[in-house]
């Protein structure tokens, strides 16, 4: 108390008067707060209710951002109505009109992002079977299939690739409709069914070494429709999309393994009429393939192990010796299935 009196005494007279005015003003405000004003109109409370409802929407809800922006827009509209009709406050109206325009633009953007994306009718099958289970969005799938690929057809009997002639560097394809058969020097190897890669072994084996040619002949056994990518442009695209690169790596590895298993498992064949054609690999044991694949986590290493393990078996069969020796254990291709 003594310190306070000393400070007041040492201050100039005009400053003392200002302090007294401030003290008087504060005391006056305190007396004014004793009388509360009447409750605002119902529209004011509706606006705040909309804000509160938007903030408590759980983030786990799929459309929570759209609902949040919608509730904020509704709350701003109620505030504008309240400011114009019941308060006649221009500043409140301007601020809420600004907030309304910002939230409404964001609301429109979010609704646009949620629009259903159309996928071509011919491509719906491979999307739902191959890409959708791996969480590839329709938008990303359309980017993958809409820029540097095309849908092509082959009539029955036409060839997709000819051994020792067709380059493997040009394309990568997925069969959409029909069925194809793979053969070597007239000997049937295996069939290619819809929703499967046509040339996945060649694509994997020549990632580092270019300039190779097909070592097998791939022929349309029915009227076929396939999706074809330009290999060079696809490679550049996948370099900029690490997620899709891993998806392709997984799908191609799975496709090669499926082709390998299908050699000795007729139930995996799509057409029974192809099962009647003798395959040079039909006498190999499925257990040999399973054991070789189980011995390693890498598909290519497993295939190479399988090749080494089956080369002895093939040498014991005169009708298979010429075929298996033509490939040996060289680069991975359709020949791994023998």
Swiss-Prot record:
A GO cellular component annotation in the UniProt record? bicellular tight junction
UniProt entry keywords in alphabetical sequence: cAMP, cAMP-binding, Cell adhesion, Cell junction, Cell membrane, Developmental protein, Glycoprotein, Membrane, Nucleotide-binding, Tight junction, Transmembrane, Transmembrane helix
One Pfam match, by short name?
POPDC1-3
Q: Where, in residue ranges, is this chain on the Extracellular side?
A: 1-40, 87-91
Q: Which residues cross the membrane?
A: 41-61, 66-86, 92-112
Q: Which residues form a coiled coil?
A: none
Membrane-topology descriptor: Multi-pass membrane protein
The molecular function terms of the Gene Ontology recorded here are: cAMP binding; structural molecule activity
Where is this protein localized, as stated in its record? Lateral cell membrane; Cell junction, Tight junction; Membrane; Cell membrane, Sarcolemma
So which residues have sugars stuck on them?
Answer: 21, 29
Per its UniProt record, what InterPro entries does this chain match? cNMP-bd_dom_sf, POPDC1-3, POPDC1-3_dom, RmlC-like_jellyroll
Superkingdom, natural source: Eukaryota
Q: What is its main location?
A: membrane
Ranges in the Cytoplasmic compartment? 62-65, 113-338
GO biological process assignments: epithelial cell-cell adhesion; heart development; positive regulation of locomotion; positive regulation of receptor recycling; regulation of cell shape; regulation of GTPase activity; response to ischemia; skeletal muscle tissue development
Q: Answer whether the UniProt record assigns the keyword Cytoplasm to this protein.
A: no
Q: What does this protein do?
A: Cell adhesion molecule involved in the establishment and/or maintenance of cell integrity. May play a role in vamp3-mediated vesicular transport and recycling of different receptor molecules. May be involved in the formation and regulation of the tight junction (TJ) paracellular permeability barrier in epithelial cells. May induce primordial adhesive contact and aggregation of epithelial cells in a Ca(2+)-independent manner. May be involved in epithelial movement during corneal sheet formation and regeneration.
Q: Which PANTHER family match?
A: BLOOD VESSEL EPICARDIAL SUBSTANCE, POPEYE DOMAIN CONTAINING PROTEIN
Q: Which family does it belong to?
A: Belongs to the popeye family.
What this protein is called in its record is Popeye domain-containing protein 1
């Amino acid at each position: 108390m003594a310190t306070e009196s000393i400070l007041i005494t040492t201050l100039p007279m005009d400053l003392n008067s200002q302090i007294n005015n401030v003290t008087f003003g504060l005391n006056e405000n305190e007396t004014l707060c004793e009388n509360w004003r009447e409750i605002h109109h119902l529209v004011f409370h509706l606006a705040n209710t909309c804000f509160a409802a938007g903030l408590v929407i759980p983030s786990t809800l799929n459309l929570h951002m759209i609902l949040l922006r919608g509730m904020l827009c509704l709350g701003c509209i109620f505030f504008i109505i309240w400011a114009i009709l019941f308060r006649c406050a221009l500043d409140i109206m301007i601020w809420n009109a600004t907030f309304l325009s910002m939230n409404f633009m964001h609301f429109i953007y979010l609704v646009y992002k949620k629009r259903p994306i159309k996928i071509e009718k011919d491509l719906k099958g491979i999307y739902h079977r191959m890409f959708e289970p791996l969480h590839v969005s329709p938008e990303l799938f359309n980017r993958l299939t809409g820029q540097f690929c095309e849908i092509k057809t082959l009539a029955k009997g036409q060839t997709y690739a000819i051994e020792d002639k067709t380059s493997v560097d040009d394309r990568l394809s997925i069969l959409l409709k029909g069925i194809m058969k793979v053969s070597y020097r007239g000997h049937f190897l295996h069939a290619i069914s819809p929703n499967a890669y046509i040339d996945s072994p060649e694509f994997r084996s020549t990632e580092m070494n270019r300039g190779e040619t097909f070592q097998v002949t791939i022929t349309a056994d029915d009227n076929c429709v396939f999706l074809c990518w330009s290999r060079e442009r696809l490679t550049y695209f996948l370099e900029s999309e690490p997620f899709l690169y891993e998806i392709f790596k997984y799908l191609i590895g799975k496709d090669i393994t499926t082709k390998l298993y299908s050699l000795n498992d007729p139930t995996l064949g799509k057409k029974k009429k192809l099962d009647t054609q003798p395959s040079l690999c039909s006498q190999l044991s499925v257990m040999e393939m399973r054991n070789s694949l189980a011995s390693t986590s890498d598909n290519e290493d497993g295939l190479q192990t399988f090749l080494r393990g089956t080369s002895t078996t093939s040498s014991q069969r005169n009708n298979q010796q010429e075929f298996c020796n033509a490939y040996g254990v060289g680069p991975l291709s359709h020949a791994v299935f023998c």
